[in-house]
Amino acid sequence: MIFKQIESGGDRNYAYLIASEETMEAAIVDPSPDPQKVINMVKEEVVEIKYIINTHSHYDHSAGNDKFGGTKKGRSIIFINCGSDTVIKDGETLELGELILEFIRTPGHTEDSICIKVEDKLVTGDTLFVGKVGGTYGEEDSKIEFESLNKLMILPPDTEVWPGHNYGETPSSTIGFELKNNPFIKRLDEFSEFLWLKQNWPKYKLEHGIK
């Protein structure tokens, strides 16, 4: 597997290139805010784009989609989770050469948030960061995100976590690391504790020296 994390500008955004080494077909995840950096990586790896995937619809993840429209080598690029007519179901899979992309619906940060699992890697968008979780608006969204994060935590502890922004101390981590170190994940047994941290996060960060 070819797997590339791409620093794509904006608010420390990450885009991703996932490709089959057998067919050189590629999936691009969140090609924004600077799609040219993604295009450069596609050229460098000499791959053919098959899928454009958005982890969610926020502009800083989806604005570059239109740079990848049209047909390449006689085949249309397939857009996934890029609007109402491209919705992917929870647990649905797609083939990418010898690779299987598995989609996990993780609403909370947004209603359309998804994570993508391929082999031992999990691209989490704005659902889960290194040491942090995605922002939510109000108690109801926080509850939905709480349930989504619990769904992710049943994955094997060595599953690699690849987030949508560089908000942590490292560019990636693992499910096991997050279970032991992420203050939000450590509060997934009780929603009231998770919600408390959501509501008091600025103060908590200051008291614990978290950037």
Whereabouts are the PLM-identified features?
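Active-site HxH/HxHxD metal-binding segment of metal-dependent hydrolases
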Residues: D11-R12, T23-A26, P31-E102, K180-F184, ...
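Structural motif
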Residues: A15, A26, L101, S113, ...
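Histidine-centered catalytic micro-motifs
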Residues: I52-S62, I104-D112, W162-G168
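Core dinuclear metal-dependent hydrolase active-site scaffold
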Residues: L17, G91-V118, L122
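Conserved beta-strand hairpin/beta-sheet module of binuclear metal-dependent hydrolase folds
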Residues: M1-E45, C115-G125, G131
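Accessory terminal helices/loops
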Residues: I2, E147-K211
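Active-site metal-binding loops of divalent metal-dependent hydrolases
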Residues: P31-P33, S57, G108-T110, D120-K121, ...
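Charged helix-capping and loop-helix junction motifs
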Residues: E139-L149
